[in-house]
């Protein structure tokens, strides 16, 4: 004889659905506001991140017929796969501005990725409330914990492609899924977690299909490497393996940033660990484990940003959808806690844009335009908008100097010879002590603001 009341069970289910819909309806305006904020900033000539100008410069070099992958003696480095540059170059022919083109592509990719999460959650059996909560969680994390939404960077394009590949895989289109996953890798090379997890999961589900999927990925990946060498005359793997310092301090900082938004969702997704798991539970847990392990490994490197844990955010969003669908959200507190988490960080997030920075950027662009010629720009976007010629990849060359892979004497001599009309750096130490000493001897600081430090040759007024 049962002891529970069907009316009590019905009431509990109804309360859970109300709690979930409240969470969705409260989270949606926050996401819409932040997404609109990022989208409206797309045309602004304000640097969002040093990556923007760097990506735009390579797209412009491609359009101009220059080398997309300069040989090692060059002071400009390209350590990204090629596909995103072709995409941005195509859009630049419409916009006239490569940075704006990259931002538009990023924003569209963001929306496409959210659409893919909705479709994947539906494929995994989630109803509309759970689907929406999963997508809104991911949307909020990307907006609050990073500055990548509508930023000229290929990360979100790569994720959108790989999520489309996962959707194809769940629909049984194994070879098309493998090809799409590899396309994502040729957009951004750090997107390893999802292909790895999908391959292992499919092997466990259907050995023949899993072997077909892995073989198709390997074959298309190797074909891409051969095509790259034929097109560019060099090895893509060698281009990607640029020297970079690593440290435990970098890893600790990345873990702290991850914990700020992921600790509570990770706790909630432990609901997928149960004696009897569905095949989708296993897929999401594999994906999450791979994303966290690879993200942690990559996070030790200099210059690694919040994007290294985007795969973890996607896996958590799908996991939350499954947990919410299964448990109906056991009580309102978890939903309200997530809302509080995002609400408290709205004013303390990675999006640095406002009237003050816009004014500074306009003045800095005018300053660079007034001193035409080759320039050293850490914020390459400022140089591009000013019509200046960026001559040095500050981050990658700086890392090469710090690791001993390159000798800074050549650049130090060029600086002492006043080869550059202007220098713009984030710090005097960006290019190491030898170059810093050369700057101190040959250049004077003109001004400093939120965009960095600006130097002119000492013999110029």
What are these regions, as identified by a protein language model?
Residues 117-143, 159-160, 174-176, 280-282, ...:
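Transmembrane-helix signature of polytopic, membrane-embedded enzymes
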Residues 193, 301-328:
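Hydrophobic/aromatic-rich transmembrane helices and adjacent perimembrane loops
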Residues 25, 100, 104-125, 133:
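Transmembrane-helix motifs of polytopic, lipid-linked glycan transferases
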Residues 15, 194-219, 241, 245-247, ...:
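Perimembrane helix-loop-helix junctions
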Residues 162-164, 168, 174-189, 194-202, ...:
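Membrane-interface alpha helices of multi-pass inner-membrane proteins
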Residues 53-79, 83-86, 90, 169:
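Extracytosolic helix-loop segments that constitute the early lumenal/periplasmic catalytic or substrate-binding loops
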Residues 140-144, 157-176, 180-181, 315-319:
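Specific aromatic-rich, kink-prone transmembrane helix
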Residues 341-461:
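Extracytoplasmic
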């Amino acid at each position: 004889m049962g002891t529970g009341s069907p009316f009590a069970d019905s009431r509990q289910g109804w309360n859970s659905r109300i709690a979930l819909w409240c969470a969705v309806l409260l989270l949606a305006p926050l996401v819409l506001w932040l997404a609109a904020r990022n989208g409206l900033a797309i045309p602004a000539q304000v640097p969002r991140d040093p990556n923007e100008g760097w990506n735009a410069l390579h797209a412009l070099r491609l359009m101009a017929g220059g080398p997309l992958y300069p040989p090692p003696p060059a002071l400009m480095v390209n350590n990204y796969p090629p596909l995103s540059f072709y995409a941005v170059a195509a859009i630049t022919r419409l916009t006239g501005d490569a940075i704006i083109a990259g931002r538009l592509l990023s924003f569209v990719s963001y929306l496409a990725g959210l659409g893919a999460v909705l479709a994947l959650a539906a494929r995994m059996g989630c109803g509309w409330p759970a689907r929406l909560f999963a997508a809104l969680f991911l949307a909020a994390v990307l907006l609050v914990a990073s500055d990548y939404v509508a930023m000229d960077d290929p990360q979100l394009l790569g994720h959108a492609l790989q999520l489309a590949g996962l959707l194809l895989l769940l629909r049984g289109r194994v070879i098309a899924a493998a090809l799409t996953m590899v396309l994502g890798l040729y957009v951004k090379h750090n997107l390893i977690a999802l292909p790895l997890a999908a391959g292992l999961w499919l092997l466990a589900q259907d050995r023949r299909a899993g072997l077909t999927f892995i073989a198709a990925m390997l074959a298309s990946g190797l074909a891409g490497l051969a095509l790259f060498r034929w097109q560019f005359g060099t090895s893509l793997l060698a281009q990607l393996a640029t020297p970079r310092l690593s440290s435990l301090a970098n890893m600790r900082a990345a873990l702290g940033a991850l914990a700020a938004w992921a600790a509570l969702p990770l706790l909630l997704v432990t609901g997928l660990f149960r004696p009897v798991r569905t095949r989708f539970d296993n897929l999401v847990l594999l994906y999450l484990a791979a994303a966290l392990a690879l993200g942690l490994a990559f996070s030790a490197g200099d210059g690694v940003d919040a994007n290294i844990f985007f795969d973890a955010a996607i896996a958590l969003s799908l996991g939350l959808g499954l947990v919410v669908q299964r448990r109906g959200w056991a009580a309102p507190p978890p939903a309200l806690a997530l809302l509080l988490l995002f609400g408290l960080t709205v004013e303390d997030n990675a999006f640095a844009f406002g009237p003050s920075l816009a004014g500074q950027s306009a003045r800095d662009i005018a300053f660079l335009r007034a001193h035409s010629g080759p320039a050293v720009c850490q914020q390459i976007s400022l140089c591009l908008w000013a019509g200046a010629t960026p001559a040095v990849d500050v981050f990658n060359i700086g890392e090469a100097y710090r690791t001993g892979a390159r000798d800074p004497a050549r650049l130090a001599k060029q600086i002492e010879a006043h080869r550059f009309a202007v220098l713009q750096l984030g710090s005097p130490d960006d290019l190491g002590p030898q170059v810093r000493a050369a700057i101190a001897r040959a250049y004077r600081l003109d001004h400093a603001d939120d965009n960095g430090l600006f130097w002119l040759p000492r013999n110029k007024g």
